[in-house]
């Protein structure tokens, strides 16, 4: 499961333990029910929404699982909608959705390739999230020269995401690799999943 937006394997990123990791599932369920009730939803007035995803068997399975859990735990009525890629992109770009499935693979091996997506002016900000403190933290991190200070800024940004939930990360991409023990320099901690031959070498065996 994903406890942060930024993958844990990202170079230089040292995530703090999130609220999701500190509480039991029962406690989290109770909080979700309380938030729904505070928003005016409940058994007599269930929240109804559409979950949009681009056509794919794996995306469909995840969407069905999410809808089932939301119904069972929270009484939410979820309608599933799948669209072919071009139509899906149009819906995503115009904001024509209630909840949408999306993913991101880093452009470079540093946390800002993920966290920058939720800044208010980023073209990839599908959630249309706007938070001045969040924007300020990313700009501040870009000026820092102390790695510990950068990590602190990134963790504060992750906390804002956790508190305000513009997105709900559920998993991170992983790829299995079989690497001979005499092959060294293969980048294990790299969310790009890019391996450059110039960094690898073979030891005597």
How would you label these PLM feature ranges?
Residues 2-8, 46-50, 171-174:
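Short coil/turn segments at secondary-structure boundaries
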Residues 29, 33-106, 147, 175:
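Ligand/substrate-recognition segments at binding pockets and active sites
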Residues 4, 62-64, 111-114, 182:
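Short, solvent-exposed loop/turn and secondary-structure capping segments
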Residues 1-5, 43, 108-110:
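Proline-centered turn/helix-capping motifs that create local helix->coil transitions or kinks
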């Amino acid at each position: 499961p994903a406890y942060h937006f930024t993958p844990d394997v990202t170079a230089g990123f040292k995530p703090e333990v999130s609220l999701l990791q500190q509480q039991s599932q029962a406690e989290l369920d109770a909080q979700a029910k309380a938030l729904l009730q505070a928003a005016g939803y409940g058994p007599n007035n269930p929240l109804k929404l559409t979950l949009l995803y681009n056509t794919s068997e794996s995306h469909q399975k995840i969407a069905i699982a999410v809808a089932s859990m939301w119904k069972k735990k929270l009484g939410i009525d979820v309608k599933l909608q799948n669209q072919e890629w071009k139509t899906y992109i149009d819906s995503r770009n115009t904001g024509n959705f209630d909840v949408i499935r999306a993913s991101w693979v880093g452009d470079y091996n540093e946390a800002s390739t993920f966290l920058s997506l939720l800044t208010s002016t980023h073209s990839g900000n599908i959630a249309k999230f706007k938070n001045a403190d969040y924007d300020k933290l990313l700009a501040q991190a870009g000026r820092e020269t102390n790695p510990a200070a950068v990590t602190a800024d990134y963790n504060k940004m992750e906390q804002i995401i956790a508190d305000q939930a513009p997105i709900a990360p559920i998993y991170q991409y992983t790829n299995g690799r079989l690497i001979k023990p005499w092959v060294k320099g293969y980048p294990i901690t790299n969310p790009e999943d890019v391996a450059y031959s110039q960094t690898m070498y073979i030891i005597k065996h």
